[in-house]
Amino acid sequence: MKKIILVCSALLCHFILVAQGKYIQGKIDGIPQEGFAIKNLFNPISVSSENYDFTKDLSQYTLATVSSDVLNEVVNTYEYALEVDIPFEGSFLTLQLMKSNFVTESSVFTAQNNHGKENFKYPLGAYYYGVVKNMPGTCVGISFFANDIIGMIAMPEGNIVIGKSNVKNALSEEYIIYNDKYLKIENTSRCGADDDRLKTLIPKYDTKKAVRTITTNCVKFYVECDYKTYQDFGNSVVSTTNFATGLFNLVSTLYLNDSVSTAVQQVNVWTVTDPYAADMNTYDALVSFSTQMQGGFNGDLAHLLSKRSLGGGIAWLDVLCDAAYYRSAVSASLSANLTPLPTYSWNTMVVTHEAGHNMAS
């Protein structure tokens, strides 16, 4: 019988994370000031061009535009270290960033239809982690793409989200920066690892078979995006993959700050109805996803991302050395129909939590 219990990962709580994790600060401290390429990327604005009342969702926020020329320069040159000023609540936060290697040219990117998986040429973003300059106890993860930025700053005072002010408008060049403690809406997602059905589920698969040794140096993820996520990103494989890699950069940054190395080995996007479409909760989705993964996958852990409203996330516990069936997790209800605002801190929390179950953190 496979044991599933509820574990509260310390990585979930930003105030625990930033108090304990110092790895990234140490890496940044090792870069001389002249080693940072300074990029003037953001320009604060006072009036939104989006037809949306942000005060319905937030009590405080900052709006900005981004220089497309500078953004393209950041993506194309992919400097080892950057310094970027972020407008925030009438002032600026200076981000000191260094290049992340959680996704590389060797990572695999596929789109899946009724005929199977097909590789596609994915234009990699520029992925970074770092800190806020002169602010101890901070941790930054941020990804730059040709027409998008996905970022989050973990601070003792809350999580600061950086993203397009309307994530449903792919053409928008307006960004919003806000502390998630000022959100007026509540995310009711929950972790399903305490589901009694999982605690009593008797596996059909022998966990002593197909067991493999996982490297202690880096945990590699196979990431799958369901059809609903693909639809929500305008049926764009690239935009959906940007969402996945941008999200996992945030997750990877949080783990790295606690000296746990992770990487994305493959991202697969469903472009047709997926095998999980009939599942109405995270429990059923996990069983379906685990069944799909039982034959093996490209990575150490498999993670399904879904924007369907399934109630949150769920995962098997402590499975790094188990059969492929169990090395899986589901993170659903990712910003599903709550607001056009970017809610990357919620998404990051769900994925980090469920991946932590798999690793027994």
Please name every model-derived segment.
Residues 21-28, 32-53, 58, 170-326, ...:
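Fold-level signature of zinc-dependent metallopeptidase catalytic domains
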Residues 303, 349-361:
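Active-site recognition of the HExxH zinc-binding catalytic motif
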Residues 82, 128, 149, 219, ...:
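Residue-level detector of short, conserved catalytic/binding motifs and their immediate flanks
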Residues 98, 133, 154, 224, ...:
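Structured loops at beta-to-helix junctions and adjacent beta-edge loops in soluble globular domains
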Residues 1-24:
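Bacterial Sec-dependent N-terminal signal peptides
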Residues 20-167, 287:
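N-terminal prosegments of processed precursors
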Residues 332-352:
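Short pre-active-site segment immediately N-terminal to the catalytic Zn-binding motif
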